[in-house]
């Protein structure tokens, strides 16, 4: 009897570790796109002339060090630091319902440092504190599960970063495609 109980507990633990709830495609796609939007904003704030040495700090047999200079804003060092805090900015996003198509997406409603508040159409946003927390959680999951892809795309690519990361690399927007944030 005790063996059956242990076996039942093991099977339940095994199955529960492999079963994941269905992710809301709008939420996770929105979190990924908002993540890219915030990363690009942070990158634009850094002086483009600022560089950092990357590469091996080992000395080759001929006495030379293999190092390269890369823009600081696109360095793994800087991006990793930014990623640690980026999901806190998800509170500045809300669920937006397009008045024409009724398509839902997450858009930024809070103005940044130099932006005015006049360009935001608040009547089509659905403000809900639980949605904000869900978006932050989804962002944290995206960073946790896809950090390597995020760093790779941001450091190597220049165009269509949201599409490249969120659709091609992670597949988070395959079910739910957007044109803009």
Swiss-Prot record:
Domain of life of the native organism: Eukaryota
One of the record's GO cellular component terms: endoplasmic reticulum
Coiled-coil zones: none
The entry's keywords: Developmental protein, Disulfide bond, Endoplasmic reticulum, Signal
PROSITE patterns (UniProt xref): ER_TARGET
The keyword Signal appears for this protein: yes
Motif Prevents secretion from ER: chain residues: 178-181
InterPro entries: CNPY, DUF3456
Secretion signal, residue range per the UniProt entry: 1-21
Localization in the cell: Endoplasmic reticulum
Domain Saposin B-type: start-end pairs: 25-177
Disulfide-bond pairs as recorded: 29-173, 32-166, 87-139
Similarity annotation: Belongs to the canopy family.
Functional note: Plays an role in early embryonic development.
Name of the protein this chain belongs to: Protein canopy homolog 1
Organism encoding this protein: Xenopus laevis (African clawed frog)
Gene that this sequence comes from: cnpy1
